Amino acid sequence: MPDPAAHLPFFYGSISRAEAEEHLKLAGMADGLFLLRQCLRSLGGYVLSLVHDVRFHHFPIERQLNGTYAIAGGKAHCGPAELCEFYSRDPDGLPCNLRKPCNRPSGLEPQPGVFDCLRDAMVRDYVRQTWKLEGEALEQAIISQAPQVEKLIATTAHERMPWYHSSLTREEAERKLYSGAQTDGKFLLRPRKEQGTYALSLIYGKTVYHYLISQDKAGKYCIPEGTKFDTLWQLVEYLKLKADGLIYCLKEACPNSSASNASGAAAPTLPAHPSTLTHPQRRIDTLNSDGYTPEPARITSPDKPRPMPMDTSVYESPYSDPEELKDKKLFLKRDNLLIADIELGCGNFGSVRQGVYRMRKKQIDVAIKVLKQGTEKADTEEMMREAQIMHQLDNPYIVRLIGVCQAEALMLVMEMAGGGPLHKFLVGKREEIPVSNVAELLHQVSMGMKYLEEKNFVHRDLAARNVLLVNRHYAKISDFGLSKALGADDSYYTARSAGKWPLKWYAPECINFRKFSSRSDVWSYGVTMWEALSYGQKPYKKMKGPEVMAFIEQGKRMECPPECPPELYALMSDCWIYKWEDRPDFLTVEQRMRACYYSLASKVEGPPGSTQKAEAACA
């Protein structure tokens, strides 16, 4: 997941205060000259380095608990770019407003931080180990949940560092530091037997010094009376630049031979999944024989952890178990199906009922589409076509068909997605559901549609009503009644005649020439985006089909929904390009939607936090 400031030309990444000042000197030291850099103290925070009266000023920008960004005592902003734009108009307590960005020289990329270099491998390890996923299921999980997983693993990144020794006594630490070259500044970090505390051991002048590192009630790490940090690795990086109470700066790591490094492979202890985390407490009964606890405590929020798609029973196919796969057939035995007296929905075809399907090793909740008695033969054939199509599809973001049961009626047995359709879920929840959550769900839909595109399927009925929720953070595409499988060499399907089509979701070529392709699904995706970002409003409100067609032919498009981020409306507009061949494909749509979602996930909306303004010394 890229840094939210990575696209800013005046963002330098993980550079020191001295390096920032050198860049500002080279740029001329004009009043209002500024740059942005990563903050070593605050996870996800920044430092604004500013010139005024030929002096340097450094202001830490902290990421608030609600995901906004603020200089201490100042207004909160949804992202670093928005914060800098605000201070370019109003100094609001700074010595002067931001007047001239000190842009990076041509060819110079932002300097990656320590965690940046480890993040991708740690995310992959965490997802693989926590949910036991492999292959495509693993890749889909990494893409869809990277913002959430990154927040979990940042606190354990120190376990991948060469200077971290997970089980070392004070005496053993001294022996290690005295062995070999006794270079001033040689150091290591180890856990102490008191839960949640650590010791930093440092050699200087042939003597080893030990410094206590503890956590405060907010979970921040510090040496007593020293600067506080969100993580241990940030504290170490800071102390490499500034002694800050130590006898000497940290210079050279005393390596742990079993730690993961550039050439090693030992994995860190990954954080427990949020649902298993507890508040820290001193576990005297779990001390090892040498007095050390096996795993440092982690301070966590008392709030209920947010669910991830991988936590649900419908992320992987019920047939992902090789034993269950042996019984996979299109037609199911009625004896294995229990139909509850609970109706989930109804329509012209019949009803959808809740049920349970008994498999070889487990029972699963299912939704059962029951065709009503006396149904026309054509409707029965259409339902069987839908079943044939759905049975071929296997993706976490598509409702899977378990099978068909022919008994008292024709029944399609599908995965349960009990949260209901997306548009109904969002109605009236603008204040409750942030745009970042909506973008998360839309990104999942784009992943499902990219899968269909790769499989050469055209959905033909993509709309918010056909996006079902498993929970607030997990969406699946449903209703494949109009879907078609294209031939290997075909790029579109031509319908023989027009039916009861959802014209407000259809691209011009569908209405005018009955031509359907993955690019016409892209048009429908744009309308689905509009529905979701309008929080369940109806598209083309009060217009009828012919009026919608005329509206589109005149080059008009629906307006940007209120408070919809411009980058999302830009994607929406590209989905509505008139010529189908000029529209993006779902590969491109998913990539752009992913970038929007990641950006919004890193700057969650919320009420401004309140802090006290003060210029602070920071690295």
UniProtKB/Swiss-Prot annotation:
Residues 338-600 form the Protein kinase domain. Expressed in T- and natural killer cells. Also present in early thymocytes and pro/pre B-cells. The modification Phosphotyrosine is found at Y248, Y292, Y315, Y319, Y492, Y493. Its EC number is 2.7.10.2. It is a peripheral membrane protein. Changing K538R: No effect on ubiquitination. Phosphorylated on tyrosine residues upon T-cell antigen receptor (TCR) stimulation. Phosphorylation of Tyr-315 and Tyr-319 are essential for ZAP70 positive function on T-lymphocyte activation whereas Tyr-292 has a negative regulatory role. Within the C-terminal kinase domain, Tyr-492 and Tyr-493 are phosphorylated after TCR induction, Tyr-492 playing a negative regulatory role and Tyr-493 a positive. Tyr-493 is dephosphorylated by PTN22. Ubiquitinated in response to T cell activation. Deubiquitinated by OTUD7B. Residues 103-162 are annotated as: Interdomain A. Changing D327P: Increases constitutive kinase activity on LAT phosphorylation, strongly increases subcellular localization of CD69 at the cell surface and decreases autoinhibition conformation. Residues 10-102, 163-254 form the SH2 domain. The modification Phosphoserine is found at S289. One of its GO terms (biological process) is B cell activation. There is a cross-link at K544 (Glycyl lysine isopeptide (Lys-Gly) (interchain with G-Cter in ubiquitin)). Pfam families: PK_Tyr_Ser-Thr, SH2. It is found in: Cytoplasm; Cell membrane. The modification N6-acetyllysine is found at K603. Changing V314A: Increased constitutive kinase activity. Residues 260-309 are annotated as: Disordered. Changing K544R: Strongly decreased ubiquitination. Interacts with CD247/CD3Z; this interaction docks ZAP70 at the stimulated TCR. Interacts with NFAM1. Interacts with adapter protein SLA; this interaction negatively regulates T-cell receptor signaling. Interacts with FCRL3. Interacts with VAV1. Interacts with CBL; this interaction promotes ubiquitination, internalization and subsequent degradation of CD247/CD3Z. Identified in a complex with CBL and UBE2L3. Interacts with SHB. Interacts with adapter protein SLA2; this interaction negatively regulates T-cell receptor signaling. Interacts with CBLB. This is Tyrosine-protein kinase ZAP-70. It comes from Homo sapiens. The lineage of its organism: Eukaryota, Metazoa, Chordata, Craniata, Vertebrata.
